[in-house]
Amino acid sequence: MRLFHLSRHLIQSKTFSLNRITFPVYSKMENNEKVLVGCIGGSGLYHLDNLTFVKTVHIETPWGKPSSPINISSLPSGALVAFISRHGSHHSITPSEVPCRANIAALKHIGCEAIIAFSAVGSLREEIAPGHFIIPDQIIDRTKGIREDTFFRGEGLVVHSMFGEPFSQKLNAFVAPRVEKILKETGDVVLHTGKTVVCMEGPAFSTRAESLMYRQWGGDIINMSVIPEAKLAREAELDYTLICTSTDFDAWRTGYDPVTVEEVVKVLHTNAGNSRAVAAGILQDVHDVVVEGKTLTDIKGSMKFACVTRKDIQPEASRKKLSYILPYFSD
């Protein structure tokens, strides 16, 4: 959190039933409309620039509706990208209430293989000033267990996904130099990499004691959104990279007032413009590298071996439900 815009066009729907519950299922994109890259916009970032609108897709997944309709837009090359606004089209969904399972499931179901997510963050380090960009490579989870953080809970299956490297290392490495180049051209904005993001529950900001504790733990930035988004992307076998924009210094600096919404909003406008420039500048390259298959080698197929429950005792209804995001559960 720390605070993308959509139109209409329904795609054809059918339904399937699980335990007497009927879910609408929407037809996949046509082959020439395959969407490989999804964008999730955070606070202040509600649309993308320099793209041609194609359609809006309204989907209801087995885990409910996404936080916004999915906007499908075309890059100058004709390649398609999908966009979801994490907190809703009008920023009406709190961090704890974001339907992350539906967001990730919807993007996977329409064909996405990689996600570029954006998030406003607070800085826990003096060198990460408001306006700076950060691509983290680690997460400290300080959420409270009230968010739905797995596709497998209650399904009669025990699944342990690999999460030692919570972001796609290859996609991070691919994106970082491109982001840095764009930021220098945009206005000499600083990019930090190799940082750790703390994800807190919210919606209140940190106490000063908490902020100081996160610094001692090795946290560099703090937000309210990366968990469970990153965990669910891993379970759906999607490459996931988070591009963060610093808006404030949280509450750790003695002699300064703790962060306020007013302070955050002052920086959001500039950060959002830079984020749109970054997205417009990297999406084609990300699409191309996904087409070439250079980023998914460590993730694709990994969940097949993460399930420790024997196939013959896995509930059929659960397998059918999970096949929405992991097709091999339909085998």
UniProtKB/Swiss-Prot annotation:
Physiological role: Catalyzes the reversible phosphorylation of S-methyl-5'-thioadenosine (MTA) to adenine and 5-methylthioribose-1-phosphate. Involved in the breakdown of MTA, a major by-product of polyamine biosynthesis. Responsible for the first step in the methionine salvage pathway after MTA has been generated from S-adenosylmethionine. Has broad substrate specificity with 6-aminopurine nucleosides as preferred substrates.
Name of the protein in its database record: S-methyl-5'-thioadenosine phosphorylase
Self-association state and partner proteins as the record states: Homotrimer.
Entry's family note: Belongs to the PNP/MTAP phosphorylase family. MTAP subfamily.
Organism placement in taxonomy: Eukaryota, Fungi, Dikarya, Basidiomycota, Agaricomycotina
Superkingdom of origin organism: Eukaryota
Compartments, as annotated in UniProt: Cytoplasm; Nucleus
EC number: 2.4.2.28
Single GO biological process annotation from the record: L-methionine salvage from methylthioadenosine
UniProt catalytic activity: S-methyl-5'-thioadenosine + phosphate = 5-(methylsulfanyl)-alpha-D-ribose 1-phosphate + adenine
PROSITE patterns, per database record: PNP_MTAP_2
